[in-house]
Amino acid sequence: KLAPSLKPKKRYILFKILPETKGKTFWKREVIEALEQQIIKCFGIFMHAKASPMIVKETFEEKSGQIIIKVGHKYTDELKVALALLKQIKDHNVTIEAISTSGILKKLKERMHHQTGKA
């Protein structure tokens, strides 16, 4: 078993997808496909493997447009830039902004639900 100090450190980043068209929502599959393609496009295959970004699938909320992505702690800034450069999802203009970063998923989920008004 690996000692905790030797385990790869990770960060969870809460992103918000802001569509240009007010009230527009996206299907979970559309968002995940667009984000994964953008990450590979910006990171390249080698850096993608090192950063190991993963979309925490159960965290996507269609109404609020929020999603949490897990990434290696050294690559948080690169991930934020890669997703900020994403301008379209399914032919709709979008802006993606990073809301918060945490090393603990539970804390980020609480922040996410606090922002959307859920308990």
Residue ranges and their predicted role:
Residues K1-L2:
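Glycine-rich, charged/polar anion/phosphate-binding loops
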Residues S5, K16-T59, E97, L108, ...:
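Surface-exposed, low-hydrophobicity interaction/linker segments
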Residues P8-I13:
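Short structural boundary motif marking the start of a folded domain
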Residues K24, L86-A119:
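Long, charge-dense
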Residues F60-I68:
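The conserved glycine-aromatic submotif of the RRM
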Residues K70-D77:
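Helix N-cap motif at beta-to-alpha junctions
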Residues H73, L83, S102:
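A short beta-strand motif that forms part of the nucleic acid-binding face
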Residues L79-L86:
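Short amphipathic alpha-helices in soluble, non-transmembrane regions
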